[in-house]
UniProtKB/Swiss-Prot annotation:
InterPro entries: TCP10L/CENPJ (IPR026581). This is T-complex protein 10A homolog 1. The keyword Coiled coil applies. PANTHER family: T COMPLEX PROTEIN 10, T-COMPLEX PROTEIN 10A-RELATED. It comes from Homo sapiens (Human). Residues 7-19 have a biased composition (Basic and acidic residues). The keyword Repressor applies. Self-associates (via leucine zipper). Interacts (via leucine zipper) with ZIPK/DAPK3 (via leucine zipper). Interacts with MAD4. Keywords: Coiled coil, Nucleus, Repressor, Transcription, Transcription regulation, Tumor suppressor. GO terms for molecular function: DNA-binding transcription factor binding; identical protein binding; transcription corepressor activity. Belongs to the TCP10 family. One of its GO terms (cellular component) is nucleus. Residues 69-110 form a coiled coil. Residues 150-163 have a biased composition (Polar residues).
Length: 215
């Protein structure tokens, strides 16, 4: 009985007493041998073409990953810089809007402040300048209107003067020729009357008188 138990407890061939599970050493030896065979095939160039393509693709993928990681990091840094610039510009814009609003508020509160500052700046050069009254401010406006009307009238008169004169002399000559006969006709009529007076004896009626009597 004791001999049979001792034989059963003895380790089998191919196992190690320190191994946790029987047969593990054989499996490790097989994997090591397969790895050695693969390395030898790779070194000798006897690997099939499909495996070579897979290895090349893995290498290319690793390179692309590294490149994309670099590009991604650069883009991230650029985007962060743009965001910071955008925030700074927004802050500056808000400050400018605040300044404009304050300036408008001050100008609305004191409308004559700008005029007073301008007069104060001109005083050392031209002496003290008194502000214009309401009547004095309106005078230049009316003066400007008068000047404009005067220029318009002058332009109209100049245009009328530049127009050609109407032929009045021709009308006067026609009227005078129609009313008064020429000098030659007058002389002829006077000579005829004198001849008639000489030809008719005294006591006889003139042809003009005969005509009147017959009428």
């Amino acid at each position: 009985m004791l001999a049979g138990q001792l034989e059963a407890r003895d380790p089998k061939e191919g196992t190690h007493p320190e191994d946790p599970c029987p047969g593990a050493g054989a499996v490790m030896e097989k994997t090591a041998v397969a790895a050695e065979v693969l390395t030898e095939d790779c070194n000798t160039g006897e690997m099939p073409p499909l495996q070579q393509q897979i290895i090349r693709l893995h290498q290319e993928l690793g390179r692309q990953k590294s490149l994309w990681a670099d590009v991604h990091g650069k883009l991230r840094s650029h985007i962060d810089a743009l965001r910071e610039q955008n925030m700074e510009l927004r802050e500056k814009l808000r400050a400018l809007q605040l300044q404009r609003w304050k300036a408008r508020k001050k100008s609305a509160a004191s409308p004559h402040a700008g005029q007073e500052s301008h007069t104060l700046a001109l005083e050392p050069a031209f002496g003290k300048i008194s502000p214009l009254s309401a009547d004095e401010e309106t005078i230049p406006k009316y003066a400007g209107h008068k000047n404009q009307s005067a220029t318009l009238l002058g332009q109209r008169s100049s245009s009328n003067n530049s127009a050609p004169p109407k032929p009045m002399s021709l009308k006067i000559e026609r009227i005078s020729s129609w009313k008064t006969p020429p000098q030659e006709n007058r002389d002829k009529n006077l000579s005829r009357r004198r001849q008639d007076r000489r030809a008719t004896p005294t006591g006889r009626p003139t042809p003009c008188a005969e005509r009147r009597g017959g009428v």
